[in-house]
């Protein structure tokens, strides 16, 4: 916020803190479209992926976007905080026959990992929170380089990104891994040829949908880039109240780990 306020000086713009004023609800899963339709949000089927539109709710406006953090068909709804409870009740009533239920962070984290999505300060450290220079990551180093348009006008970091690309100074690469066995490798060290430390797993799980042991890891280039073979992870697994070290083979795996056609189907499927 201080940075935004400083940047606004000299411009005809107002910066306001609205964190407490706006409530967000995520409706995710194969029946999400049908629930919105049954809740009375007419024409919500016209929304394509990343589209958003305003709809009427309880004397106010709710912004609905076809987005989400699960890799499945889903929507996110933003409404004035005072209307959040009535919106919740409206959705729960419309979804009762379809088994709607609230989920917690553990379930959401599993879904986002299967979708290959990354989390700030979990899979990478943001510039705001990084204390050590070697913890910083450029967009290209966390798989987000495609979001940076080098032809765009000036923006913070523009020169540094172009220089790193031109001089091949990118030091890390974020990759998906498939790991042998079924023991999650969260926070495991990644080795090359079982001896040279080359990276760290930031998120990992046994995926019930992909039926694979999956992970996201940050590796030091050229590992994960031009060198992709003979990678191993060091896992410490609890065995009868004692930790046992396991060295498991890992291979580079494309993300997302699962791909659901219904996520991008137009019009959305009616489950």
Model-predicted segments: where are they?
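Conserved, structured C-terminal
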Residues: 1-271
């Amino acid at each position: 916020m201080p940075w935004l306020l400083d940047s606004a000086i000299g411009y005809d713009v107002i910066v306001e803190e609205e964190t407490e004023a706006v409530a967000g609800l995520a409706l995710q899963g194969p029946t999400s479209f049908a629930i919105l339709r049954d809740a009375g949000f007419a024409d919500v089927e016209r929304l394509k992926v990343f589209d958003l539109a305003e709809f009427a709710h309880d004397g106010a406006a709710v912004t609905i976007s076809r987005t989400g953090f699960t890799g499945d068909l889903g929507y996110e709804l933003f409404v004035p905080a005072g209307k959040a409870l009535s919106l919740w009740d409206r959705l729960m009533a419309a979804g009762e026959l379809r088994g709607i239920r609230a989920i917690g962070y553990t379930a959401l984290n599993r879904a986002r990992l299967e979708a290959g999505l990354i989390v700030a300060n979990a899979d990478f450290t943001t510039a705001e929170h990084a204390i050590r220079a070697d913890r910083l990551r450029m967009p290209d180093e966390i798989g987000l380089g495609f979001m940076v348009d080098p032809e765009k006008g000036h923006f913070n970091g523009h020169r540094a990104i172009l220089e790193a690309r031109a001089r091949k100074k990118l030091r890390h690469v974020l990759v998906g891994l498939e790991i042998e066995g079924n023991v999650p490798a969260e926070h495991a060290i990644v080795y090359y040829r079982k001896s040279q430390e080359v990276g760290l797993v930031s998120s990992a799980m046994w995926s019930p949908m992909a039926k694979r042991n999956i992970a996201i890891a940050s590796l030091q280039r050229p590992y994960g880039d031009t060198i992709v073979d003979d990678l191993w992870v060091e896992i410490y697994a609890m065995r009868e109240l004692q930790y046992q070290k396991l060295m498991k083979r890992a291979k580079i795996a494309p993300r997302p780990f699962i791909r659901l056609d219904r996520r991008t189907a137009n019009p959305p499927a009616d489950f």
